[in-house]
Amino acid sequence: KGVLPKNYARPDLDKTRLGELVDLFSSIKVGDKESRSKDMLGRVYEYFLARFAGAEGKGGGEFYTPKSIVKVLVEMIEPYKGRVYDPCCGSGGMFVQSETFVEEHQGRKGDISIYGQESNPTTWRLCNMNLAIRGIDGNIGPNHADTFHNDLHKTLKADYILANPPFNI
């Protein structure tokens, strides 16, 4: 609730097109039944994030770290349990991969707690959407905020800190 911007609820939005889009995604058959049901919407969302980042060029690094790099970073820190913090969380890829890591190692979704913040308002919404699509509870603040000027987690004692390498420099 409250993840989508208010303009997605506007009366003039073509609901027929939206329904067709949902039907299209529902009809996609990739792999076996278990693979199809497992995070299909999340994978589609991630695909589009990567495409948008590529189209943005250097600026795309503000919100998207390639999945291969995120996976290596998460596997290096091995966040089995505890608090995971990303001070400039972008679209939330570090959080998604951390949850995936826990599940792949027979952990439960609640074994880690997610904390982060993002200064760009659009990217902050992308992160909220990314977490919501995957059913991940996280605390990325009630609104966008710059970690340097408005730290939303001043008292947090994180067990793991992940951050995007500065690809956009």
Q: What are these language model-derived features?
A:
Residues 1-80, 139-152:
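Non-catalytic, mostly N-terminal accessory regions of nucleic-acid modification and defense proteins
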Residues 59-163, 168:
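Conserved S-adenosyl-L-methionine
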